[in-house]
Regions:
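Conserved alpha/beta-hydrolase "acid-adjacent" motif
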Residues: 553-559
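Alpha/beta-hydrolase
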Residues: 119, 239-294, 450-536, 542
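Short beta-strand/loop motif that positions the catalytic acidic residue
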Residues: 546-548, 552
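Alpha/beta-hydrolase-fold enzymes
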Residues: 209-242, 383, 387, 405-510
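Amphipathic, low-complexity, repeat-rich surface-exposed segments
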Residues: 1-301, 312-313, 350, 563
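Short amphipathic alpha-helix adjacent to the substrate-entry channel of hydrolases
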Residues: 331-349
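Short beta-strand element of the alpha/beta-hydrolase
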Residues: 313-323
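Alpha/beta-hydrolase active-site loop
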Residues: 361-385
Length: 582
């Protein structure tokens, strides 16, 4: 946790490493010193602590059986059943893929071979690498040295049976013990990791390639490398093979049916199920904190939550969540609902629920969302609560809109918002991470075409696919293995249910957001004009709290920290653990 010094900060430092919190004041240490300076009363005597009865530990799960044992136990009867189920699975898979192909060809006229400019970026990288023979020589020498080491160690392993000590498993793709205990799988795993590191390192070592091109090439190389992992193929995944032999092929039959459901739900495109979508219902077992809609216009509904304390704080709290997905990210279930926690602390909580737009809202703009969203919500809270000041929270893109509107309010002398808290929200987009790959003019034109095809809105699945690609191992390939190869049903998970409850976005709003923020970084550079005013975050002098997360891949911590430096008043910055939403 850091306090950002209230001083002018040069926001145009030379390209290089992103800024980190340097020389910042640790406010926790200050509070500790203040507490230490106060006289303390003598502690009252305490009874000795009771001896807690430790609950019995649950029995450890049995390790999965080695594949060799399962294969050796197969009988003629079991192999016959396995063969029959495999034949049935292949027949059904052919039907599923044929149906999906027919569904996809309905939009064949709009297909583009390389809509995001992947090949152009890769060609640029390879052409520059071709002029670096020493780099290529050293990289290949290192690769063959690793191959030789892998071969030598695994030959010794097969001859002696002594498994090499490799430390803890850090890559979740290879958590099955067979990836280490079986020399063949172990060698395959290590060879893949060596090769993937060789390829990705080459991209990084290409000289003379601009940052945007290198970022795009690195992103798509990583997608290809992740897809090529041996864990993603039935015949080279020990967990999938184990399930195949243990169930006589029924696991694959179930997996094909799971695949069929997801392709049907995606109308020919793969819409991967990440949770049990039938396990939750809004207002029944998610988003259950009592409240009512107190205002509505074409852009949003305003929910006021019922108080749970006898008295409440005078100043209400107004929350602006992202318009990507639904409003209840902060109100999943009572045990993890921030909304419930806030009302239990005596806060009067208002929350904006953005509209899920249709084609009629294609021309609605970012400025409309500021005027009819932020300003209208502030007016409505002022009327409902009977007060002329309030605290605010902006989450993700909701925070970006809030920051821009605060700058406009400062220009107009509107002082009704007395503080702002930002969760995983960027105002500066120079270091905005892999989403910058989709935010050059090539990517924006591709999305614009997609929105035109959809009648002027960005289809929810397009945004979901983009976010999944940012973490493909966790959000794509993990489910390919579990759902389609092993035949598991994804378990209920409230957060992933919310993640799957997607919304559309108006065309003009989204294009403005991509061009002005991701591409041009106009807000922090003082070049964003809204409602007739050129905005500057230095005009925003109210207290600001900025929360980032260490593993956030959508609003990277370094980007949020840079955003914190853009405001003109006191700012406290906190980097938490975990990722964008968990």
């Amino acid at each position: 946790r850091y306090t950002i010094p209230n001083r002018e900060k040069d926001m145009t430092e030379a390209d290089g490493a992103a800024p980190r919190p340097e020389g910042a004041t640790q406010t926790a240490a200050k509070r500790a010193r203040r507490r230490a300076a106060k006289p303390k009363a003598e502690a009252a005597p305490q009874p000795p602590p009771a001896t807690a009865t430790q609950p019995p530990k649950p029995p450890a799960a049995e390790p999965p059986r080695p594949l060799n044992e399962l294969i050796m136990e197969q009988t003629a009867e079991s192999l016959s059943a396995l063969s029959a189920n495999l034949t049935q699975a292949m027949t059904r898979a052919n039907q599923v893929f044929s149906t999906a192909f027919i569904d996809q060809t309905k939009d064949a006229a709009t297909w583009q071979p390389d809509p995001l400019g992947m090949q152009v970026a890769l060609n640029d990288v390879w052409s520059h690498l071709a002029t670096q023979p020493e780099t290529l020589r050293d990289a290949h020498a290192k690769l063959w040295e690793r191959y030789a080491d892998i071969w030598q160690r695994h030959t010794a392993y097969m001859l002696t049976g002594q498994q090499p000590d490799e430390g803890p498993v850090r890559d979740k793709r290879f958590r099955d013990p067979e990836w280490r205990s079986n020399p063949a799988f172990s060698m395959l795993r290590e060879s893949y990791l060596a090769t993937s590191e060789f390829i990705t390192d080459l991209v990084e070592k290409a000289e003379g390639v601009d940052d945007a091109t290198k970022r795009k090439a690195a992103f798509f190389i990583k997608q290809a490398v992740d897809a090529a992992s041996p864990s993603n193929f039935l015949m080279t995944n020990p967990a999938a093979l184990r399930a195949l032999f243990q169930t006589g092929g029924e696991s694959l039959l179930k997996g094909v049916e799971n695949l069929a459901k997801d392709l049907k739900r995606g109308e020919g495109m793969l819409a991967i199920s990440q949770t049990d979508l039938d396990a939750y219902k809004v207002g029944v077992n998610v988003a259950t904190t009592p409240g009512k809609v107190v205002f509505r216009n074409r852009v949003f509904e305003l929910i006021q939550y019922a108080p749970t304390t006898e008295t409440v704080h005078e100043v209400p709290l107004l929350i602006f969540p992202p318009w990507i997905n639904k409003f209840y990210i902060l109100d999943l279930q009572p045990k993890n609902s921030m909304i419930k926690w806030l009302t239990d602390q005596g806060h009067t909580v208002f929350l904006v629920s953005w509209v899920n737009p249709d084609e009629d809202m294609a021309e609605v703009t970012f400025e409309d969302y500021a005027r009819e969203g932020i300003y209208a919500a502030v007016d409505a809270v002022e009327k409902a609560a009977g007060v002329s000041r309030m605290n605010t929270v902006g989450y993700c893109v909701g925070g970006t809109l809030l920051a821009a509107t605060l700058a406009h309010m400062a220009k107009k002398g509107d002082e009704r918002i007395q503080s702002a808290t930002f969760f995983a929200s960027q105002s500066d987009f120079k270091y905005a991470g892999d989403l910058l790959v989709f935010s050059d003019e090539t990517g924006i034109k591709f999305l614009e075409d997609k929105m035109d095809q959809a009648g002027g809105v960005l289809d929810a699945q397009v945004m979901a696919d983009t976010f999944n690609a940012l973490r493909s191992n966790d959000l794509i390939w993990n489910y390919v293995v579990d759902n389609y190869y092993i035949g598991k049903q994804p378990p209920p998970f409230d957060l992933l249910y919310w993640n799957a409850d997607q919304t559309r976005m108006p065309k003009e709003l989204h294009l403005f957001y991509l061009r002005k923020f991701y591409r041009d970084n106009a807000l922090t550079e003082g070049k964003l004009t809204m409602m007739g005013e050129t905005l500057s975050l230095k005009d925003v002098t109210i207290p600001i709290f900025m929360q980032s997360s260490k593993e956030d891949h959508i609003a990277p911590a370094q980007s949020v920290y840079r955003s914190a430096q853009a405001f003109g008043g006191p700012v406290e910055y906190l980097m938490a653990g975990s990722g964008h939403i968990a």
